[in-house]
């Protein structure tokens, strides 16, 4: 019986069935706890789909960079891009049919999802303040092969645009720095002539 529960809880059938047919909890507290513990935060199916798609399009990246706020799922330092791959339920995707609220323990889930959304907003703001371009990819955007392909193409384009913007900023910074050095040199030369 335990083997059956383990395989059932780990399958996508369980999650899809519960979303379509909400029902009272038929599992014991320990069984429910086991099912919930099998839900991962890293290397999720949507995250792997995005990684495979980006790799196939020629991008190279870092995973779960814990030196950045919020440990973004995918980081492309060359382009200055941090990608968050969010599950619609766990991150409270507004207007999404997959972001349903559980029927039991409603207060707990509303508070938890609200906290998750607030944490995401703070993390994104912090990353942007550090100069990163933050892209959020939602789980629902990756459902279906044609939708997945078009979303990954759009994501690749957004990454390239962010990289171009980063290059322009670097060039401006270098130019301004060079101009500042020249201006400082001129001021020092004038000062030396006056002495």
Q: Where are the language model's segments positioned?
A:
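Nucleic-acid endo/exonuclease domains
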Residues: 14-195
């Amino acid at each position: 019986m335990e083997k059956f529960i383990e395989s059932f809880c780990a399958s996508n059938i369980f999650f899809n069935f519960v979303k379509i047919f909400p029902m009272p909890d038929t599992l014991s507290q320990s069984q429910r706890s086991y099912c919930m513990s099998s839900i991962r935060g890293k290397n999720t199916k949507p995250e792997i789909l995005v990684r495979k798609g980006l790799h196939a399009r020629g991008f190279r990246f870092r995973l779960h960079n814990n030196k950045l706020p919020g440990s973004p799922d995918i980081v492309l330092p060359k382009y200055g891009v941090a990608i968050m791959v969010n599950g619609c339920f766990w991150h409270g995707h507004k207007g999404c049919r997959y972001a349903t609220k559980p029927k039991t323990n409603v207060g707990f889930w509303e508070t938890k999802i609200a906290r998750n959304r607030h944490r995401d907003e703070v993390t994104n703001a912090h990353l942007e303040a550090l100069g990163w371009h933050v892209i959020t990819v939602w789980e629902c955007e990756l459902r279906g092969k044609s939708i997945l392909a078009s979303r990954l193409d759009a994501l690749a384009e957004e990454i390239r645009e962010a990289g171009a913007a980063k290059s322009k900023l670097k060039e401006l910074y270098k130019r301004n720095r060079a101009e500042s050095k020249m201006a400082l040199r001129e001021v020092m030369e004038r000062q030396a002539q006056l002495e």
